[in-house]
């Protein structure tokens, strides 16, 4: 007898082949049978008539490194059909750590990934020093989602080199040898890869760039050679230029990545986004990735399935946050509804619009966001509820201002304070230069590009892209109206088999016999994203943006139902996923 059988559904099996009517049977946490009709009884049966059945989604770009130590649901990813997450990206993580340097790693993560430091300080248990000890601590965790991690270069460099590493001083041959040894040790203990950041905008709360940002080639190759030594692992990075800065070096990055991958015979995956300064640079990099394959390299650009940018509202960073009248009203009105009502008063509006910003706090890395947003209002869009991530030009704040005969700053003010004040506007920084998704469609369609950059668990106060797996289905396979859609089978494969295969997780990602029973049953016709909300549910009352979905009828991990109609069941089959051992 099977443990569970899913009948009556349309199987989109993750291989990219055409969807078909079929059944899936599960036994002992594995897929035991798949076919048009599977004979045999089951202890439990799910009627999936009118639903699609997919593999669980594998999200390879998250930052749950701290959250996984206290949260057993791993929201928001768990609510979007994700059954496996990979963390430790962008060169930041929490192991190895020198005793007494825990808070330094926290302020590094807070600065780079906008995760409240107070939440990390209260939530992380710090049961480790070395990376293998970190994995052993994680192995004790039982969650609703499987999780794997990479070794972060930033933490490793600071551990080996101390203050010299933290301050980005050059590594000596002995430093490199030790980092190589510890990287090999981490891979052999189960790390899925090693990650680094070379992005100038990735900075700790103390203003210092991530350790390794300026690492010389011999240091980077030392990390890569450790992967070759261990015979496993992925080299992941946020390359120079990925944030729109340092674009000269962005073109050089591909050369060393190509050389490294061919030399170590391991995949290299890196963030790739379209930027406004050189809007065709991404295509040059993608073409280089194709050419690299002919030279024995494995380069896989990680791409975002929608515009990559900020969510702006009264509860996040916005242009008025440092204006005296706004600050006073925010102190007097503790609820967002009361604050919005006060801001709707014409006298208060006039006062705020007439004021200058107070000086930014030099000790707060994010306090200057108000100024940045104010000069980028031409990129700000009203996206509505439910959110439309491909808004037409007339929905930009600039266009609304022109139509109403006011300045953009006033149009932005009116949009922020409307209703109950919880509105979120979108400010795309990348992937929306032309005001549509055609570039993104080209990226997703490319065989070497990997779906990623959701940043689940990170950018808590500004970005909310952990819902991308759902968006891939609703927008690209069903709802897009301003251009061509993508086949459902392709969209599912992009975030199941393709992502799992990149990180060597070949036991999952498809609905095939013997594979891990990670499955979604989805009401595809009614699948939708809800509006983005700000909640204070992290340790110490830390805030984060959440976006829930409707339409996931069942999410199954290792054969156990973890979500039913979007609600957590309490099942905790999720475990640490170790790589080569």
What label would you give each PLM region?
Residues 134-138, 144, 150-160, 167-173, ...:
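Active-site neighborhoods of metal-dependent hydrolases
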């Amino acid at each position: 007898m099977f443990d569970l059988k899913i009948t009556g559904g349309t199987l989109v099996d993750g291989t990219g082949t055409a969807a078909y009517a079929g059944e899936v049977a599960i036994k002992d946490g594995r897929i035991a049978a798949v076919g048009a009709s599977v004979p045999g009884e089951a202890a439990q049966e799910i009627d999936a008539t009118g639903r699609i059945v997919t593999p669980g989604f594998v999200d390879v770009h998250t930052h749950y490194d701290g959250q996984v130590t206290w949260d057993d649901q791993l929201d928001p990813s768990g609510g979007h059909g994700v059954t496996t997450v990979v963390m430790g990206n962008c060169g930041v993580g929490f192991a190895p750590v020198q005793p007494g340097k825990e808070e330094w790693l926290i302020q590094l993560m807070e600065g780079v990934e906008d995760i409240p430091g107070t939440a990390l300080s209260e939530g992380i248990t710090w049961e480790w020093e070395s990376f293998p000890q970190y994995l052993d601590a994680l192995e004790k965790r039982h969650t609703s989602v499987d999780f794997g991690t990479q070794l972060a270069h930033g933490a490793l460099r600071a551990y080996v080199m101390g203050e010299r590493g933290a301050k980005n001083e050059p590594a000596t041959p002995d430093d490199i040898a030790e980092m190589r040894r510890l990287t090999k040790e981490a891979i052999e203990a189960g790390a899925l890869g090693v990650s680094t950041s070379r992005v100038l905008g990735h900075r700790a709360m103390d203003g210092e760039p991530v350790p390794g940002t300026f690492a010389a080639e011999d240091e980077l190759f030392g990390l890569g050679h450790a992967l070759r030594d261990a015979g496993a692992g992925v080299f992941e990075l946020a390359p120079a230029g990925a944030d729109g800065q340092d674009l000269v070096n962005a073109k050089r990055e591909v050369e060393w990545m190509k050389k490294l991958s061919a030399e170590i015979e391991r995949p290299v995956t890196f963030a790739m986004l379209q930027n406004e300064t050189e809007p065709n640079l991404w295509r040059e990099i993608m073409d280089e990735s194709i050419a690299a394959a002919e030279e024995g390299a494995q380069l896989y650009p990680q791409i975002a399935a929608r515009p990559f940018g900020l969510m702006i509202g009264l509860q996040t960073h916005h242009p008025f946050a440092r204006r005296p009248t706004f600050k006073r009203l925010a102190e007097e009105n503790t609820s967002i509804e009361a604050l919005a009502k006060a801001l709707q008063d014409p006298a208060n509006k006039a006062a705020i619009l007439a004021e200058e910003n107070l000086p930014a706090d030099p000790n707060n890395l994010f306090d200057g966001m108000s100024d940045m947003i104010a000069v980028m209002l031409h990129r700000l869009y009203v996206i509505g509820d439910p959110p439309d991530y491909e808004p037409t030009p007339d929905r930009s704040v600039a266009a609304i201002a022109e139509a109403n005969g006011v300045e953009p700053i006033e149009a932005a003010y009116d949009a922020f304070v409307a209703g109950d004040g919880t509105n979120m506007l979108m400010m795309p920084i990348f992937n929306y230069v032309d005001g549509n998704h055609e570039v993104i469609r080209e990226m997703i369609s490319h065989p070497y590009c990997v779906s990623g950059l959701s940043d689940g668990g990170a950018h808590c106060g500004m970005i909310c892209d952990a819902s991308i797996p759902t968006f891939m289905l609703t927008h690209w396979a069903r709802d897009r109206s301003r251009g061509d859609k993508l086949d459902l089978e392709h969209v599912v494969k992009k975030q199941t088999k393709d992502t799992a295969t990149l990180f060597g997780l070949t036991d999952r990602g498809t609905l095939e016999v013997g594979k891990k029973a990670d499955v979604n049953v989805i009401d595809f016709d009614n699948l939708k994203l809800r509006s983005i909300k700000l909640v204070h549910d992290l340790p110490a009352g830390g805030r984060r943006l959440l976006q829930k979905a409707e339409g996931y009828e069942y999410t199954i991990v290792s054969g156990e139902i973890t979500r039913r109609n979007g609600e957590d069941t309490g099942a905790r089959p999720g475990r640490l996923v170790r790589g080569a051992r």
